[in-house]
UniProtKB/Swiss-Prot annotation:
This is Glutamate receptor-interacting protein 2. Residues 945-963 have a biased composition (Basic and acidic residues). Its main location: cytoplasm. The gene is grip2. Keywords: Cytoplasm, Developmental protein, Repeat. Gene3D superfamilies: 2.30.42.10. The lineage of its organism: Eukaryota, Metazoa, Chordata, Craniata, Vertebrata. Plays an important role in primordial germ cell (PGC) maintenance and efficiency of PGC migration. Residues 58-141, 156-244, 258-342, 468-555, 569-652, 667-749, 974-1056 form the PDZ domain. It comes from Xenopus laevis. GO terms for cellular component: cell cortex; cytoplasm; mitochondrial cloud; pole plasm. CDD domains: PDZ1_GRIP1-2-like (cd06687), PDZ2_GRIP1-2-like (cd06681), PDZ3_GRIP1-2-like (cd06684), PDZ4_GRIP1-2-like (cd06686), PDZ5_GRIP1-2-like (cd06682), PDZ6_GRIP1-2-like (cd06683), PDZ7_GRIP1-2-like (cd06685). Residues 434-444 have a biased composition (Basic residues).
């Protein structure tokens, strides 16, 4: 470690403070010490090394005939202790090997133990040992790096050293050890005078070696590190870590300081000077500080500090050259009177936080003080301070406009206009270490901004948001980010640093999510606000070594104009190779425009504040997209340069504003207390279809609030918007919501309920066939449900296996338009009046902890002989009793038992319900569209919708082939496949479906594990080891299969038609109806 001793001398009479920095080279340095003195000191200090601090190394020396080792040994059985190195002759073989330190103990020479030898015997042995000398050396391990010291901070630097023999002119000790108590960093314990490291001048005793020629020395033993150094070329690039002192005296100084620094004769301080103007007077300022120099390490001087005097000589009338010459003429102790930079200019913070108060000390640089020409400024005679002039001057400081570009004249900063203002400064936190800051709670992880609107640059109304960005760079070029914050590098920041500059064609620019002026909140989880600018830069440099960094940034989003509906234009700046941040989706439905399906947070598109998912893209640069495909639109965008003009249409249904068509929006907070919410939500996997509440449990939590009703649309769950999210994501959010669930509800004051279609109506007489596309869109927007028939997911064991009435005969995805009855009592009445259940059901997901609503299910007891002649039998005692039992459990407070039942249902364990899960049949009648779920003697039926969609001719032909197939039947099976250890595979391949989502068995190796397990070609894989794969493609499913281990548990869907093998997977697996096909492209 490299230490500095600080002595404070308070001079109350003259109003000055004095700080003295004396260099202490630590216990390993011997350059300027008398060898005899070292010997005596070591005798008193080190008779032996405690085991926990003892290190051992092997030193091999090759001496020429007639030459000596240049090594002085003291000790022996007849002397004062164990044999040890008491002196190394400068220029001798032992000194130039750079492997020995004075004070090292010699245990053995060429395998001969020295413990029981007298002093003369040891000397004789060394003289007659031969050309090759192998020494076993014990040394004291270097002290560990302090973890919680707030008085120093580490920095790193790369230096290049020339090799001299097999070494670079320094001794290092430490390294990894099998006993973790003895593991240390590789620490420099001695720099040989005149050696390569000494001539270069940067490396000092106490510095840690991190890397050599790109080879990391982390967790490397001392022996391996020496071997790496010997194998280096003639020029080695070293990355070293050194310590910089944090001087509270300097940071908290209220006026000039007298700084005394001791340096080695012939060495330089490591500062360069320049001239500047302060209060209309020319001053000498520190322009730059050389990294790892004496000045940098002491932490007392910083760029921007004013030098008032050098060794008592005033610099008021000195030129830059004269001041530099004056510094160079000082041999050892340098005495400088400085004015720290934070007292010579405005602090980097908004003007309302600037506080100017009268100083008790008057110096030659004050505008109201007559300077008396004396080399001792403390002896100046000063007149009485003029309060009035001081007050006026303070007013002018506070009234001055402040911006991030106002520090352009400050050394070390360049003028950059920021489009984001610094945040309001909070009270400065106490200085903490990086480890403590890493454990601090983040306050910026909300996905929705909770901050209120503020006024930004130019009077624009903005709000702040934050996001996390992953950048990938390289150690040579980094990430392309330059930061700005504070006055000097070691000042503790009271607000996060700003991004000052983004390098062209760097990872930061190419990601398209960063802009100049953004606030950097954290780097790899470490908050930047309580650290220093140098620490932030160091974190970026360290992250570059691993080629990856996670940045949390805060930025401004404009909200001066936020259109709720209508058509408008948006202009976005575009740079070559940088994404706009929008993802567009194309719908196959004729006449439907392209849709913005996603917007990257932090992108140019997001910061405008006017675009949101669901907006329609009508034109790009005045080129209408009516007849353009998504690929054409992408091509048009790629050809745009500098500025992109987008024509956008926002529908009222895509707006969350309360002013839209009489909607009322409010927030409801539900506290579960371990119980169920009591709601059933419905929706589809289409990203912009609404998610509504389709059922409420009688006397349940949601119903008791009186604020939630059937038909209400859910806009957000726990402040996470559902816009652009499918039903599955909404379900996941509810499952992960915890004890408190906050729902943002949108209620239509005038609800339009869908009219039920006649039971006798067939597909050809669908009344919606006569509607135009725009009328269909309007109608669907009035209905709270637009797709997927209803299957209650309380039986999650079925849903987890891919069984869903919204999926075709093979469990494939069929996005079909359906409605929902919003009045359960009407539904129940209609069931009593008619044997045919309602035509339109929705895909519903109740959150009732496993309770079943009687009205949600139809339970026929036998399969009808005629497709259109379904007979409904109300002898459904099992399901009625089961549902009533669950309701009784809920009302009597048995929530724990309810949760156990829910757990068994959610994990797919049908056996827990007393049902036979060995085989589940889903039979689809080709004419009536009725779907039956059969389990043992219990049957559940629901109806498929009868909407006819406009299909392409090719799709129609495939559909007709499926309709012509005889009584298609779907069988769902659980299959276990054991891996073949000889071939290390499961013996089958998979492929994607052609007309629908899903993964299917493609080929099976005869006699292989899959063949022996009963797997068949064309089986659809619905679940892999309890992971649903029904909506996956091969890219997502194959990794699951690869990581399955030796056992594969599959849930498959198998078609039993006699024509299955003849028609092929694309025909059998194809859905009976197809409304839309959506593809996406990220721009």
């Amino acid at each position: 470690m490299h230490f500095f001793q600080t002595i404070l001398r308070w001079k109350t009479a003259k109003g000055q403070k004095s700080v003295t920095f004396k260099k202490d080279d630590g216990p390993y340095s011997k350059g300027n010490k008398d060898p005899a003195g070292n010997d005596l000191a070591l005798v008193s200090r080190r008779q032996s090394i405690p085991e926990e601090f003892r290190g051992v190394t092997i030193v091999e020396l090759i001496k020429k005939e007639g030459s000596t080792l240049g090594l002085t040994i003291s000790g022996g059985t007849d002397k004062d202790g164990k044999p040890r190195v008491s002196n190394l002759r400068p220029g001798g073989l032992a000194a130039r090997s750079d492997q020995l330190n004075i004070g090292d103990y010699i245990k053995s020479v060429n395998g001969i133990n020295l413990t029981k030898l007298r002093h003369e015997e040891i000397i004789s042995l060394l003289k007659n040992v031969g050309e090759r000398v192998v020494l076993e050396v014990e040394y004291e391990l270097p002290p560990g790096t302090p973890d919680n010291s707030s008085a120093i901070i580490p920095k790193t630097i790369e230096i290049t050293l020339c090799k001299e023999g097999n070494s670079f002119g320094f001794v290092m000790r430490g390294g990894a050890h099998e006993d973790w108590h003895k593991s240390r960093a590789l620490v420099v314990t001695y720099v040989r005078p005149g050696g390569p490291a000494d001539r270069e001048g940067t490396l000092k005793v106490g510095d840690r070696l991190l890397c050599v020629d790109g080879i990391s020395l982390h967790n490397i033993t001392h022996t391996d590190a020496l071997s790496i150094l010997r194998q280096c070329s003639q020029e080695g690039v070293f990355q070293i870590e050194y310590d910089v002192a944090l001087m509270d005296t300097v940071t908290n100084a209220s006026g000039p300081l007298l700084v005394e620094i001791a340096k080695t004769p012939g060495s330089t301080l490591g500062i360069s000077l320049s001239t500047g103007t302060h209060r209309n007077k020319q001053v000498i300022v520190i322009d730059k500080v050389k990294p790892a120099s004496v000045v940098d390490r002491c932490g007392a001087l910083h760029p921007g500090d004013h030098i008032l005097s050098i060794d008592g000589t005033s610099t008021e009338h000195c030129t830059q050259m004269e001041a530099t010459q004056l510094l160079a003429s000082i041999i050892e102790n340098v005495k400088l009177e400085i004015l720290p930079a934070h007292h010579s200019r405005l602090p980097l913070r908004p003007p309302e936080t600037v506080k100017v108060q009268k100083s008790d000390h008057h110096h030659c640089w004050d505008p109201c003080v007559n300077y008396c020409h004396t080399p001792h400024p403390g002896h100046c005679k000063t007149p009485t301070w003029n309060p009035t002039s001081n007050q006026d001057y303070c007013k002018s400081l506070v009234a001055a406009n402040f911006s991030s570009s106002s520090v352009a004249g400050t050394p070390g900063f360049s003028s950059q206009n920021s489009n984001t203002l610094p945040r309001t400064v909070h009270p400065m936190s106490p200085r903490t270490t990086m480890n403590r800051r890493r454990q601090k709670r983040k306050d910026h992880k909300s996905s929705l901004s909770l901050a209120s609107s503020t006024v930004g640059p130019g009077g624009q109304i903005i709000h702040t948001e934050s996001t996390e960005i992953i950048l990938r760079g390289d150690p040579l070029n980094g990430f392309g980010i330059q930061l700005q914050g504070g006055i000097f590098a070691t000042e503790t920041l009271s607000s996060p640093p700003l991004i000052r500059f983004i390098e062209p064609d760097s990872p930061a620019e190419r990601c398209g999510l960063l802009q100049v002026g953004d606030r950097l909140l954290s780097i790899n989880g470490i908050l930047t606000e309580d650290g220093t600018l140098e620490e932030a830069n160091q974190l970026l440099r360290d992250a570059a070594l691993s080629n990856k960094v996670a940045l949390e940034i805060e930025f401004d989003v404009a909200e001066s104009v936020v259109p709720s509906s209508g058509t408008f234009h948006v202009k976005l700046p575009k740079r070559k190779g940088v994404e706009l941040g929008i993802t567009i989706s194309s719908s196959r439905k004729p006449g439907e425009p392209l849709i913005i399906s996603d917007i990257k947070k932090g992108s140019v598109a997001h910061r405008t504040g006017t675009l949101e998912p669901g907006d329609k893209l009508l034109a790009i640069d005045n080129i209408r997209l009516d007849n353009c495909s998504m690929e054409d639109a992408v091509q048009i965008l790629r050809q745009c340069e500098d500025l992109v003009k987008l024509k956008i249409r926002k529908d009222e249904d895509n707006s969350d504003e309360q002013e839209t068509s009489g909607a009322i929006i409010y927030t409801v907070e539900l506290k579960r207390y371990g119980g169920p919410l009591g709601i059933t939500i419905s929706g589809t996997e289409e990203p912009f279809d609404p998610i509504v509440i389709s059922g409420l449990t009688k006397r349940g939590l949601a119903e008791r609030t009186g604020a939630i009703h059937i038909g209400d649309r859910i806009l957000a769950i726990n402040n996470i918007s559902l816009k652009g999210k499918p039903l599955s994501e909404a379900i996941h959010l509810l499952q992960m919501a915890g004890e408190t669930v906050t729902l943002k509800i949108k209620k239509q004051t005038e609800r339009i309920f869908p009219q039920r279609l006649s039971d006798s109506m067939n597909e050809g007489s669908d009344p919606e066939d006569d509607l135009t596309d725009s009328q269909k869109t309007s109608k669907l927007s009035e209905i709270y449900s637009t797709t997927v028939p209803s299957v209650d997911s309380a039986l999650e064991s079925w849903d987890g296996s891919g069984i869903d009435a919204g999926y075709g005969s093979q469990g494939t995805y069929v996005p079909q338009a359906v409605g929902i009855s919003l009045h359960p009592h009407e539904w129940r009445t209609s069931r009593q009046k008619s044997n045919t259940p309602p035509v339109e059901h929705r895909k519903s997901y109740p959150f009732l902890d496993g309770s079943f609503n009687e009205q949600d299910w139809e339970k026929p007891t036998r399969y009808p002989s005629q497709p259109n002649g379904l007979e409904t039998d109300h002898d459904d005692s099992f399901w009625r009793v089961f549902g009533e039992a669950l309701e009784d459990l809920e009302t009597c407070g048995q929530s724990e038992l309810l949760r156990e039942i829910e757990a068994s249902i959610m994990t797919g364990s049908v056996q827990d319900l007393g049902l036979d899960s060995s085989q589940i049949l889903l039979e689809n009648s080709s004419q009536g569209g009725h779907v039956l779920f059969r389990r043992g003697s219990h049957h559940i039926s629901s109806n498929s919708p009868k909407k006819e969609n406009k299909l392409s001719q090719d799709a129609r032909s495939k559909k007709e082939e499926v309709h012509n197939a005889q009584s298609l039947t779907t069988e769902l099976l659980k299959v276990t496949v054991q891996k073949d250890m000889d071939t290390d595979d499961f013996g089958f391949s998979v492929s994607d479906g052609l007309l629908e989502k899903g993964v299917y068995v493609n080929m099976i190796r005869p006699g292989g594990p899959a063949d022996r397990s009963g797997l068949k070609t064309y089986d659809q894989i619905l679940q892999v080891n309890h992971v649903r794969t029904r909506d996956f493609d091969c890219c997502l499913t194959v990794p699951l299969l690869s990581d399955a281990g030796d056992r594969l548990d599959l849930v498959i869907s198998r078609g039993l038609s006699i024509k299955a093998e003849e028609m092929g997977v694309e025909q059998i697996k194809g859905p009976l109806r197809m409304e839309t096909q959506t593809s996406t492209k990220t721009l």
